[in-house]
Amino acid sequence: MGKPFTLSLSSLCLLLLSSACFAISSSKLNECQLNNLNALEPDHRVESEGGLIQTWNSQHPELKCAGVTVSKLTLNRNGLHLPSYSPYPRMIIIAQGKGALGVAIPGCPETFEEPQEQSNRRGSRSQKQQLQDSHQKIRHFNEGDVLVIPPGVPYWTYNTGDEPVVAISLLDTSNFNNQLDQTPRVFYLAGNPDIEYPETMQQQQQQKSHGGRKQGQHQQEEEEEGGSVLSGFSKHFLAQSFNTNEDIAEKLQSPDDERKQIVTVEGGLSVISPKWQEQQDEDEDEDEDDEDEQIPSHPPRRPSHGKREQDEDEDEDEDKPRPSRPSQGKREQDQDQDEDEDEDEDQPRKSREWRSKKTQPRRPRQEEPRERGCETRNGVEENICTLKLHENIARPSRADFYNPKAGRISTLNSLTLPALRQFQLSAQYVVLYKNGIYSPHWNLNANSVIYVTRGQGKVRVVNCQGNAVFDGELRRGQLLVVPQNFVVAEQAGEQGFEYIVFKTHHNAVTSYLKDVFRAIPSEVLAHSYNLRQSQVSELKYEGNWGPLVNPESQQGSPRVKVA
């Protein structure tokens, strides 16, 4: 009797487990059974002292299907977005402006440091005042740059220019790195941030209401505190943990800070950065040429920032070795050495306020393992710490497809930015000129999210049943989700059409319908579409060979330039 009962119980458990798995799988599949798609605009906004954050509701069926959500960050002049992190990777496209990005990667050394000589000249000051500052590498970005933030890694951004920085972020909430649910979460390390995703709070409140009121008083206090992650600890505990006093611990919690998650840095931000130092030196040289008066005894606290064209030229120089670079770490190391040589040439001319650690007589901590691989502890410095996290995608010289009368297309994937392989993301930048057409195509292995940065255009998306699930106009500031294998085509309006496409695969493959026609034998096409051979030849070989088309020039030269 015991054996049949055991078998029956095991069968029942297996049946229940299979049913549960099937229900979860069916629920996930049903999220993409969309009969129509909508152009989405931001649902929520958080205004801070130094800027604005707008978010899209992650519960939109289109976003749930793609497993992503989107946010838009606007940084005013001298605006600082406070350090935060999320349990999933984040891909950011800079639609406007320029600035600085700081990423605090665990286990990596602080390679930017104040010079030792500067501290020694302070003579009479106390030992605490002589301590020199140091931090991890700072990356600079310009319009058209794509930034990648690893999951769980704190980052901050700062506007170094005179115009607002506009950054669009894709949050890949369904990424395998996220071991939580797909509800968007942002963990702030500082400030008193407001709620960016109200749907997250609503779900938490529903869970609490189902769980009863066993911890009612504690939960109420928790809700009243809010703020950064440090606000969940007591002042006494923070003081003990960081070996400081409770006054500093209270400031870390920022209970009365009304600036929220973006603050304005009065007078500008001063950090250790070779690029900012070079720009400061250039500005000082201009002052020397313009004025015959004596140079002030101390440089300004915040160096002014160079012109956008200079930044783009520097970025373009970084991109040149892309087709045949030996390794990512070596390329950045060589680039840093070039910057150091430039700084050393200018050293006798004047003392510097800030310098990179690599210009000091003593060698940086991570440089010796690079020279002698046998002494490397675990290779972290070569793999994670030197990982390139940004690349410009909007520069015309980066175009993969180009038609002078229709537009251009640039692709960014793990082949051009290897870090994307770890995060399973890629991107495409499309610029369509007046009336230009991006012919029908689909993604073989990825969902995509279109965000319009300039202009407006007509977009049509067709599902597996041949129905147009979206047929309308997209304008600046709107986004549209295109599920995997859905066929999409775009045409620019009178003012052109410019947009970024986020894709949920590190090497997303796009199939163009025109290419498919050319890959199929003429006889197959003739019988499939009931065409004559002359019509098949016209279908396969007439018109543009690439995906970019201008209908007004179709009767002219059929050639299209491919970069």
Swiss-Prot record:
<feature type="short sequence motif" description="Vacuolar targeting signal">
    <location>
        <begin position="551"/>
        <end position="563"/>
    </location>
</feature>
<dbReference type="InterPro" id="IPR022379">
    <property type="entry name" value="11S_seedstore_CS"/>
</dbReference>
<feature type="disulfide bond">
    <location>
        <begin position="32"/>
        <end position="65"/>
    </location>
</feature>
<comment type="similarity">
    <text>Belongs to the 11S seed storage protein (globulins) family.</text>
</comment>
<keyword id="KW-0926">Vacuole</keyword>
<keyword id="KW-0256">Endoplasmic reticulum</keyword>
<dbReference type="InterPro" id="IPR014710">
    <property type="entry name" value="RmlC-like_jellyroll"/>
</dbReference>
<feature type="compositionally biased region" description="Basic and acidic residues">
    <location>
        <begin position="347"/>
        <end position="356"/>
    </location>
</feature>
<keyword id="KW-1015">Disulfide bond</keyword>
<dbReference type="GO" id="GO:0000326">
    <property type="term" value="C:protein storage vacuole"/>
</dbReference>
<dbReference type="InterPro" id="IPR006045">
    <property type="entry name" value="Cupin_1"/>
</dbReference>
<feature type="compositionally biased region" description="Acidic residues">
    <location>
        <begin position="335"/>
        <end position="346"/>
    </location>
</feature>
<feature type="signal peptide">
    <location>
        <begin position="1"/>
        <end position="23"/>
    </location>
</feature>
<feature type="domain" description="Cupin type-1 2">
    <location>
        <begin position="391"/>
        <end position="537"/>
    </location>
</feature>
<protein>
    <recommendedName>
        <fullName>Glycinin G4</fullName>
    </recommendedName>
</protein>
<comment type="function">
    <text>Glycinin is the major seed storage protein of soybean. Glycinin basic peptides (GBPs), and, to a lower extent, glycinin exhibit antibacterial activity against Gram-negative and Gram-positive bacteria (e.g. L.monocytogenes, B.subtilis, E.coli and S.enteritidis) by forming pores and aggregating in transmembranes, leading to membrane permeability and, eventually, cell death.</text>
</comment>
<keyword id="KW-0708">Seed storage protein</keyword>
<feature type="domain" description="Cupin type-1 1">
    <location>
        <begin position="37"/>
        <end position="250"/>
    </location>
</feature>
<feature type="region of interest" description="Disordered">
    <location>
        <begin position="108"/>
        <end position="136"/>
    </location>
</feature>
<dbReference type="GO" id="GO:0005783">
    <property type="term" value="C:endoplasmic reticulum"/>
</dbReference>
<dbReference type="Pfam" id="PF00190">
    <property type="entry name" value="Cupin_1"/>
</dbReference>
<dbReference type="InterPro" id="IPR050253">
    <property type="entry name" value="Seed_Storage-Functional"/>
</dbReference>
<feature type="disulfide bond" description="Interchain (between A5 and B3 chains)">
    <location>
        <begin position="108"/>
        <end position="385"/>
    </location>
</feature>
<keyword id="KW-0020">Allergen</keyword>
<dbReference type="InterPro" id="IPR006044">
    <property type="entry name" value="11S_seedstore_pln"/>
</dbReference>
<dbReference type="GO" id="GO:0045735">
    <property type="term" value="F:nutrient reservoir activity"/>
</dbReference>
<feature type="compositionally biased region" description="Acidic residues">
    <location>
        <begin position="279"/>
        <end position="294"/>
    </location>
</feature>
<keyword id="KW-0732">Signal</keyword>
<feature type="region of interest" description="Disordered">
    <location>
        <begin position="199"/>
        <end position="228"/>
    </location>
</feature>
<feature type="compositionally biased region" description="Basic and acidic residues">
    <location>
        <begin position="364"/>
        <end position="375"/>
    </location>
</feature>
<keyword id="KW-0758">Storage protein</keyword>
<dbReference type="InterPro" id="IPR011051">
    <property type="entry name" value="RmlC_Cupin_sf"/>
</dbReference>
<comment type="subunit">
    <text>Hexamer; each subunit is composed of an acidic and a basic chain derived from a single precursor and linked by a disulfide bond.</text>
</comment>
<feature type="region of interest" description="Disordered">
    <location>
        <begin position="266"/>
        <end position="375"/>
    </location>
</feature>
